[in-house]
């Protein structure tokens, strides 16, 4: 065959010489496209730019403006970094280096930890290698040949990866004298890498196993141009200012203490108040939507966890104890007690759906290396609910949860994205049950009218799920809400209801959280608002500030009125300058400062000032109460 035909995204066909590559296709369309092309898609699969085309293939050309481009750029930049490290530190052993949502990383086994000065040297070497315009080439070897190659190079981590793959052939990428094991695709040349920055260093165990060697993980990011990179780095600097761990200390919200234990939060008065506000909000919103509030025990017999499948699939993340020679598991999830409530009496189809809601505290054994402030802890409280319904009610219930999420996230000012995660390799339940559950979730997503993605193989072991990822003020994604469909646990615990025909049927269970872990959500809120909580959420809504000691009696009376009316108010009657006291209240990010001087005492008023410095009209204490109540009612 001397000629082939390929189909372009618009449906048109284009003839090419046999053996033509994606680059040749781009060049045949135009010189500008050939210059902009970095990779391609053949029949939906990402491939390198020089990949040969087959007759009848559906082809798409990837440029820096394509949605897929950033991952390719970042993956190639991680290889460039590994090449630079090997050039500067020849004894370093390379392991893995994927692209991630915020950039990329690469793990190295080195004799000494990298320093900030080392990162500067690595970056400089990367720039040198990028300018060298090295060709990035893909080749396939048999696994035996690839193992021999990497053994000869002393790269035993790569040998282990190839052995674990168990494939007949593997693909390698080379650029200059650097060779790496990789599926690809990659950029055509190192000169295509134009804008990057190494951002941090961390420790990471090989394959996440604490019994394996500790490696040095170097994080970085890369973009198509320097303008995008600079904008991202500016967001990173802003994120550092908003870091919930930093603000948590400054605002006296929470702390951690090694004497207490890693990953266990100690809530201070202001933090506990913030938590209480959220929990009260949750209870009110759930009651409005027909949920029943329930509460289960902290420990349950190990036999129950064995019956549920948690012991088999999740026990490495659980804590166990023995009481009176009986083994118990500290709950990592709230579902089992809810099933016991359902089983406590005979259920009719007329009773369904039942919606059990619990602000349940759970404990999970997270590895020390992954703990991160409030975002990853070992003890946390979930706004956990389980809906038990008939199969016919399932679609409506899932749609109801998606609507619930939409309304709640609107109150907090979050946009969100949805992702359907399907059956993982390690799972329980029949094929039919998984198919039914997956289709129910998919139908609800389609009917929601919102965009969604499908994440193959990332569902929970007991059912498919919808993950809902919030977008914060810095355009970061946070996974909080989850909707999981479960046909398995009702069967394991023999949950039934009597149908209209008098026969016993199996209910469907939906596990769902709206905010997710309260701790994690508070961490996200702190960073989203930079600690400047809206009035309805603020642990302290106002502080009364006196000008001199002469105003203390009136200010105290006003304080008592506000507090009695339910306003979260504090006072600052110290013998300090007014400017000092106002500045301190601003640093504590309190929404309103109520200044009391001689004029306010004489008029029976307060002089409100917003934390940004804007002065409001004077108000009586009663007027200020109404003002705050109005803000709280409208979630301002």
Curated annotation (Swiss-Prot):
Co-factor requirement: Zn(2+)
Annotated Zn(2+) binding sites: 335, 386, 511
Location(s), subcellular: Cytoplasm
UniProt catalytic activity: tRNA(Thr) + L-threonine + ATP = L-threonyl-tRNA(Thr) + AMP + diphosphate + H(+)
Chief site of localization: cytoplasm
Keyword Secreted: no
GO molecular function terms attached to this record: ATP binding; metal ion binding; threonine-tRNA ligase activity; tRNA binding
Stretches assigned to the TGS domain: 1-63
Residues covered by region (Catalytic): 243-534
Documented EC number(s): 6.1.1.3
Alphabetized CDD domains for the sequence: TGS_ThrRS, ThrRS_anticodon, ThrRS_core
Description of how the protein assembles with itself and partners: Homodimer.
Protein name: Threonine--tRNA ligase
Organism expressing this protein natively: Citrifermentans bemidjiense (strain ATCC BAA-1014 / DSM 16622 / JCM 12645 / Bem) (Geobacter bemidjiensis)
